[in-house]
Amino acid sequence: MGEPVVVGRVGRPHGIRGDVTVDVRTDLPERRFAPGARLVRQVADGPASRPAADAAGAADAVGTAAGPGSAGDSGAARAAGPPVATVLSVVASRWHSGRLLVRFDGVTDRDAAEALRGSFLTIDSDECGPAVDPDDEDDDGELWWDRDLVGLHARTPAGDVLGEVVDVIHSPGGEILAIGRPEGGEYLVPFVREIVPTVDPAAGHIVVDPPPGLLDLD
């Protein structure tokens, strides 16, 4: 028995039949949220934490060379405080306007769906496959866990400090690094090799080589 790995977080209800939106934290949503899948709902006694670098449990990886469909579960977020766990079974799931909608067994109306809001959805770390690079033909790509990336300092090739990686966003179009700026606000940087050529957890930093306009916030 491994440790819980977060694959999603329940958002607001959708409609009146019990559907909920899910903030996906996995690159394998079609597998993790397929009908019949069983997920453990983790509810914190206190406020939910933001994704953290020291999240427990193994996780599938994201890679600088990987795009949509790369194998992985983030494992980068978990609830703060003693969790209360229950098992939810997926009845149906579908994409709607770029968001994943999920219906769970026994959740049949909007009130029941609202009661799930904010819950973390987890799987056992033993269910996570080995880290692989699915789209690097030369097998020389590198893969990184979310927990390896969050907390790293970001700088340009010239050495200018951009901030610190505060989150890894798993979107249908690929992974995005949220970099917190020292002066406030965030940069959103696509996690692809052309833009993030260097990831060095041992040195505590990444190098971001932004194309024109990427870091313009105005």
Curated annotation (Swiss-Prot):
<keyword id="KW-0963">Cytoplasm</keyword>
<comment type="subunit">
    <text>Binds ribosomal protein uS19.</text>
</comment>
<dbReference type="InterPro" id="IPR011033">
    <property type="entry name" value="PRC_barrel-like_sf"/>
</dbReference>
<dbReference type="GO" id="GO:0043022">
    <property type="term" value="F:ribosome binding"/>
</dbReference>
<dbReference type="InterPro" id="IPR011961">
    <property type="entry name" value="RimM"/>
</dbReference>
<dbReference type="GO" id="GO:0042274">
    <property type="term" value="P:ribosomal small subunit biogenesis"/>
</dbReference>
<keyword id="KW-0143">Chaperone</keyword>
<comment type="function">
    <text>An accessory protein needed during the final step in the assembly of 30S ribosomal subunit, possibly for assembly of the head region. Essential for efficient processing of 16S rRNA. May be needed both before and after RbfA during the maturation of 16S rRNA. It has affinity for free ribosomal 30S subunits but not for 70S ribosomes.</text>
</comment>
<dbReference type="InterPro" id="IPR009000">
    <property type="entry name" value="Transl_B-barrel_sf"/>
</dbReference>
<dbReference type="GO" id="GO:0006364">
    <property type="term" value="P:rRNA processing"/>
</dbReference>
<dbReference type="InterPro" id="IPR056792">
    <property type="entry name" value="PRC_RimM"/>
</dbReference>
<keyword id="KW-0698">rRNA processing</keyword>
<dbReference type="Pfam" id="PF24986">
    <property type="entry name" value="PRC_RimM"/>
</dbReference>
<feature type="domain" description="PRC barrel">
    <location>
        <begin position="141"/>
        <end position="214"/>
    </location>
</feature>
<protein>
    <recommendedName>
        <fullName>Ribosome maturation factor RimM</fullName>
    </recommendedName>
</protein>
<dbReference type="Pfam" id="PF01782">
    <property type="entry name" value="RimM"/>
</dbReference>
<dbReference type="InterPro" id="IPR002676">
    <property type="entry name" value="RimM_N"/>
</dbReference>
<keyword id="KW-0690">Ribosome biogenesis</keyword>
<dbReference type="GO" id="GO:0005840">
    <property type="term" value="C:ribosome"/>
</dbReference>
<comment type="similarity">
    <text>Belongs to the RimM family.</text>
</comment>
<dbReference type="GO" id="GO:0005737">
    <property type="term" value="C:cytoplasm"/>
</dbReference>
<dbReference type="InterPro" id="IPR036976">
    <property type="entry name" value="RimM_N_sf"/>
</dbReference>
